[in-house]
Structures are given as C-alpha cells and as structure tokens.
Amino acid sequence: MVALYLWPVYHPFIGWPPGRPLNADRPPYWLQVNHHFFFVLYSFVAMGILTVFEWDMFFPDLLDAFVLTTLPIRNSRLFLARVAAIAIFILGFLLDANFLAPLVIPASFDPPNLTRLLAGHILAVLGSGLFSAAFILALQGVLLSLLGERLFRRLSLILQGLTISALLMLLLLFPVLSGAVPVFLQSDSRAVLFFPPFWFLGIYQRILDGPGALPIYTRLTETGCLALLITLGVAGLAYPLAYLSRTRQLVVGSGTQDTRSWAAGPANGLLNATLLRSPVSRAVFHFISQTLMRVQRYRIYLVLYGGVGLSVVVSSILRLSVEHGRVQMEVSADVVRASIAIVAFWTIAGLRMAFVSPGNRQGSWVFRIVHGRPPVAATAIEQLRAARTWVLLWSTLISLSACLGARSIGSAELRSWASTASLMLIALGMCLVLTDVFFFNGMTIAFTGDTPRGQPNLALTVLKYFTFFPFVIWIPVEFELWIARSILHFALAAGVIGAAHFGLDRLHRGMVKEHCGMPGLEDDDEDFPMRLGLRY
C-alpha cells in the first residue's frame, strides 16, 4: 500500500500531490532516502513484534514434555524439528511481510538503475527483519540460560511490554523521525552507528548509490553486516542451552513458591469493607485477580494493549524539530492533555479484550451451580458490577499515575493546581465512563464466556476504534482549559460525568434484567436457536 501511495509522488498528475506541477523533477534526495527508510523500519518492527508475540512458542511446554517425550523419537531429533519450525516460521513471515513491495516499487519509483534498487531493497528489508527476530530470540535464549526459568518468567512480561512499546514507537515516530534523518546521517556523531534501522538503510543506499554513496553508508553497512552475523551466532549458541534448561525444568519441576503478597492482605481487607460488601462481588473480584495472575494468555493481551498505549502516548508527546542543524525535542501541552485519554482508553480496551476471552471456562461451573444460568437479576448485577469495579480501580490508578507524569513533563500552564485538578477529574471521568461503555453489553463473568462460533468482522472492529478513539482524545484537549477556569466549570463537568455514568448504569441494569428473564439452556439442549437471538 505504501509503495502504491508513493507512485504519484514520483509521477505527479493533475491535482496530486497538491501544489506539485506535472513536469516536476524527481523528489529530493533525502525524501527518497526516507521512502527507503520506511520499508526498512517496517520490516524491523513487524518481525520484532511477531517474534515477541510468539515468545513462548519457541521453547517446549508441559504438553510437549508429556506427549512428545513418550514417542520413540530421539531428543536430538525433537530439538532439530523445533529449530526447523522456528526457521520456517521466521523466514516465512519475513517473506510474506515484504514480498509485495518489490513488485510495485519499480513502477512507483521508476529508478535509473532497477537492478541496484531491487537488490538494495530486498537485502536491506530481509536483513532488517532477520536481525530484529534473531536479536529477540538471542535475548530470550541468553536470559533463560543465565537467569533460569523462574526468574526469567518474572521478567518476561516486562521485557515483552517494553519491546513492543519500543518497536511501535519507532513506527509511529517515523513521520517525526524522517525530518531528522538528514541531520543524523550528515553529522559526525557516533550515535548513528548504534541505531539498528540505520544500519540496513546504509545497506540499501550503499547498493543503490554504488561508488558515489556517502561515506556514512559504508560504515553503516559494515556495522549492520557484522551485527547481523554476531546476533545470529549468539542466537545459535544460546538457544540450545536455553532449550536444555527449559526441558530440564519441565521434567524436574519448578517447585512450589509462595505467591502471596504482603500488601494484598490489607488492600483486600479495605476493598471487602468498602466496595465489595456482598459475597458475590468479592468472589468475582478476587476470581478476576487470581485468574490474571495465573493464566499467561491474559497477561499477554494486557502486555500488547499496554505496549500499544505506551507507544501511542510517547509518539504523540515527542516532537523533533531541526534548528540550525541540530535536532531538538519539544512537548506540546495539548498532546500532554490527550495522553490522559489515550492511557485510559487503551487500558480499559485491553482489560475488556482479556475479560471476554473464553480461556478459563473451567471456573464457570462454580458460578453456574451456585447462582444458576442465567442467575437472578440482582445476582447478575452484582457479578458484573464487581468486574467493572476491578477495571475502574486499575484504570484509575494507571490513569492518575499518567496524569501526574504528564504534569511533571508538561509546560508551566499544566503545573498549576487548577490544571492539575482538571486533569485528574478528566482522568477519573474517562475511566468511569469508558468502563461503562466498553462493558455495556457484557452479560457474563470475566473469562467464562462461550467461544464465538463465527469470526468477528475485523473491518467493523477497526472502524469502531478509528471513530471512537479520536473523539475520546478530543475531549480533554477541548475541555481541560475550560474546566480549570473556575470552580463552577469544575462542578458542571463533574455533574456531566456523574449523569453519564448513572444513565449508562441504569440502561445496563435494564439489559441485565431482560437477559436474566430469558430461559436458560441445559447442557443437552440444542442451543442453535438461542444463538440466533430467538427464544421459545
């Protein structure tokens, strides 16, 4: 798609690109370099995210130990089969993610030397993606070999979240970074040699420009080739050691450990005495907490959404400007205000994605036996309210922390007490209303819903996010200054938030009562008519 978009940039026609004559020359040199840089960066980010997402699949799990080790297959053959599977997976996705661009680039770029362009493009994007995947695999192997399984498990989620955030930040910051690329590459700073995407951009331009390439491209090419070889070597040496460590841990076992927290007792006691006064709400609330701590799949969802949110926040706040040949960073007050809504939105969206995933239905039989299915309306309301309380508490804690962080890096106008109070009110209101909106149609306890039979409409899902997300960001940017202007405005904003919450809560109660009034299904009943929305 990007290659198709670039066609009118190199071949202008009437009206597009705006303000560019039909007989215009080729784009400036550094603009062409930025176009090449995007493909290198895309391959780097895509392969990195894919490798992080499949982090746990590169090593055997308990099911592999129970099933495969009982077969008459040598351990060395099992190891080589997994290595081959990893290689096929990485190389297959690397080709799949990049094979379309070389088919379109010749027509879009209309290069003077097609052979050099295709050779530079293919080698650069393949090397960039391969380095990204190999680096993450090598990092995982080294840490697992040195730290052991138990300590590695404690750090893996943090590493996954930070890695995804960093990779997405690179991609989202490309429009900002592209303006500074000429300054970086024309400077004599050695910092350029420590940025991996520049290495493979150097390979691209060194092959494309030939002997007339800038000297920096030769240095970047040498650094990139050496780094790729070292990374592949480290991954090849560390993976067998990590594989043996993981296999030994599966056979011997990791032992028992006390997972209780010294701070959980007083916190749970305070919650039970205030927000969770009924046994039903306590059961659901603590069921959610324990399930998230126990099931790896849900934590991966939270890591992915957290990484997306953090990358969007950082890429929105950070601005690079070039003045007098130097790159400077700037922070906009409006973007700092919008970051509060971004954090709240992606936190609650990630929790909803985890809650509706039917990955722990084994625990649903307890609620069904005790309360029935569907339960009486009052019980169902308590169950769903406990889940929303859990989401509200954590999203509020994260959003208020982001609010204080935004205040510390913002301009002087954001550090006044009136502005701080308005930002905190917006953060609390966003968490309250977004929790009501995201969980408005929820009728089941978290993690216990049925597996959907049909595939969701991806286009419709993306459209919902693209239409709702900008509106959420617009609210704090538009109303923060108005709220901070006077106490009356603050009170009016709080009243609007409260009215929206109580209105959504009342509508949700009505939907829950209607749902609970429908006849339930037994295990041996034919449930197809029920899935059509019909009742008999």
Language model: regions and residue ranges:
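Selective transmembrane-helix segments that form parts of the transport pathway or gating/packing helices
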Residues: 75-104, 374-405
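Membrane-cytosol interface motif
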Residues: 73-77, 257-264, 372-373
